[in-house]
Amino acid sequence: MRRVISLWLPRFATDRTGRAMPALRDRPFAQVLERRGRPGLYAVNSAAERAGLTPGMALANARAILPSLTILPARPNDDARVLARLAGWCGRYSPWTTACEARGEIPDTEPHISLEGAGGGGLWIDSSGCAHLFGGEEAMLKDITSRITQ
């Protein structure tokens, strides 16, 4: 029987930024993409989400809600490269791994359209025949979870 692990990292883009810039971890920040001259939120960290901001929101609306919001440019290509490296790192668990990124796009409509998956990413690991090497599926998942959050 085929067994596949799907890891969804909903805040991959902002978590990656928070690791690179620790001073931002507890402050609300958003990553912005521009489309047709209109900046919009591509990804928001948990502090910004608690303040009511969501991916897809127009930057002007986000600033009206949270004037102190820290804005950074979105780097989806960099996120994709790091996610691919992370998929390679998952080779410790199985020879069959792949990254699956969710790329959001700033919509043309205003003022707010949710971008499901924007700034997030995921990993698929074919664990068929591999879990026993880690003490079973549960132990394997615990190991993956603890290591990936470091």
Located regions from the model:
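Residues that scaffold, gate, or flank divalent-cation-dependent active/transport sites
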Residues: M1-A131, G136-S146
